[in-house]
Regions:
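Short aromatic-glycine-(Arg/Gly/Cys) micro-motifs in beta-strand/loop hairpins
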Residues: 1-2, 60-81
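Hydrophobic residues embedded in beta-strands of well-ordered beta-sheets
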Residues: 46-48, 75
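Local beta-strand/beta-hairpin segments that build beta-sheet-rich folds
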Residues: 57-60, 85
Length: 104
């Protein structure tokens, strides 16, 4: 019997987290601030990258850490090089209180 074999679950944004991010993305696109996005998944985190245009590096990455060292590092906004610009234990709070134009 193979019942002891665990199928590794691919970790990702939860459905409600993705909705929060995509709602923000749609708003920023309609304002002309963002033009494109990308998703990256590793064993440690998933990130949603936003681009001003396709030829450039990502402006920002909205990241979710699967096993953060402390709960305030669960959700991050980083720049292209991975420097943490903002962090929170709550995604909605993190994004709602962000002034994107002033972030860099």
């Amino acid at each position: 019997s193979n019942s002891h074999i665990q199928i590794e679950e691919k970790q990702f944004f939860e459905k409600n987290e993705l909705k929060i991010i995509l709602d923000l993305y749609a708003k920023m696109v309609s304002e002309g601030s963002w033009k494109d996005y990308g998703l990256n998944i590793s064993s440690k985190q998933v990130s949603f990258s936003v681009f001003k245009n396709a030829a450039e590096n990502a402006l920002y990455k909205i990241c979710k850490n699967f096993k953060p060292k402390n709960k305030n590092l669960k959700y991050l906004i980083t720049d292209t090089s991975g420097k943490i610009l903002k962090n929170s234990f709550d995604l909605k709070t993190l994004l709602k209180n962000t002034s994107w134009k002033k972030l860099q």
